[in-house]
Every structure is written in C-alpha cells, then in structure tokens.
Design a protein with these regions (language model features):
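Non-catalytic beta-strand/loop surface segments
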Residues: 1-44, 55-108, 123-155
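Catalytic nucleophile-loop/oxyanion-hole region of alpha/beta-hydrolase
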Residues: 160-161
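Short, intrinsically disordered, charge-balanced linker/junction segments flanking boundaries
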Residues: 164-169
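Inter-helical turn/loop segments and adjacent helix faces that build the functional surface
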Residues: 117-121
Length: 169
C-alpha cells in the first residue's frame, strides 16, 4: 500500500513565474489557487458529498462560489473542484487573470464566502441537481470513447492501492 503523505504544519505559499504571450499584459496575469485537504478518500459518503459540493460551488450554472468571485472582480475565470482518487483528497479553488495584489483579498473572500454558505446552507434545488447528475452518470456508465472496463479498472485503483476495497467507489 502507498503510505500516507507527510502533512504540512502550516499553510504553504508558492509563487512561480510563467510565460505569457507578447501581446498579453502582466498586470492581470496572476493565478491564485487555494487548495484545502478535505475529507477521507476511503469514505464513500464523503467522496460523493464533495463531488456534489464541487458541482454546486464551482461548476453548475449559477454556482455559488464561482459566480460570487467573478462578480466581485477576482479574475476572468474561477475553477477547480474536488481532487479525488488519492489518499488525501483536496478541494481546489483557482482564479485566473488577477492582479498580484489581489491574492490576499481573494483568499480572505473565499473563506468568507465558504463560511457564509456553511451558515446559510446550500440551495436544495442545486444540490438535488448535483445528486441527480451523479446518479444518472452512475446508471448510464457512459464514459465517452473510453472502454467501460478500463474506466472501472482505473476507478478500482482509487482505493485498492491503499489496501481498501477495490469496489469502494
């Protein structure tokens, strides 16, 4: 089995340069990403719950977190979601094309919005839509051009490599 990774004792901030096109401005070229370790990979209920949150917060039309951050001027796009299939899954929220000086206000606003959402609750219709989508995908098992056997095999590794039931997810 793959051992658990060593945890950070405190938040880690990383800044790296990247290339932009000659016609692009450096003024709004920053990307800021908040990545939070969440839940337990080997808990199928949490696994499903975070997938639903991913949809409601970032991917659905009218997604709560996505739309609020865009409306407040935090970049041209906000994306991310639940990264699963690893021992310590994480939830990522990334804004692209911000000004560098927006980093701290972006991180603060994300935490404020998540707190507000936790206190006020989720829109039940959006949550039901997320659950219905997940159920439909599971029943249809339509993986596009990928063979079902291959997809199921890869999914089994999400828990099997950690000595858990390969049929967990």
């Amino acid at each position: 089995a793959i051992p658990a990774p060593k945890r950070f004792g405190a938040p880690v901030f990383v800044s790296r340069p990247y290339s932009i096109g000659e016609t692009e401005s450096e003024e709004r070229a920053a990307y800021v990403s908040l990545n939070l370790r969440v839940g337990g990979q080997l808990d199928p209920v949490e696994y499903s719950a975070y997938q639903a949150l991913d949809y409601v917060l970032l991917k659905a039309p009218g997604a709560l977190l996505h739309d609020a951050l865009i409306e407040e001027g935090f970049g041209d796009d906000v994306y991310g979601g639940y990264a699963n299939g690893i021992r310590e899954p994480y939830f990522q929220i990334t804004a692209k094309h911000l000004r560098r000086e927006q980093k701290d206000s972006f991180l603060r606003r994300v935490r404020e919005l998540l707190t507000e959402i936790a206190e006020d609750g989720l829109d039940h219709e959006m949550l039901l839509a997320a659950i219905n989508m997940a159920e439909f995908r599971a029943r249809e098992a339509n993986f596009g051009s990928a063979p079902k056997g291959l997809v199921y095999g890869l999914q089994s590794f999400e828990s099997w490599i950690y000595d858990a039931d390969p049929c967990l997810h």
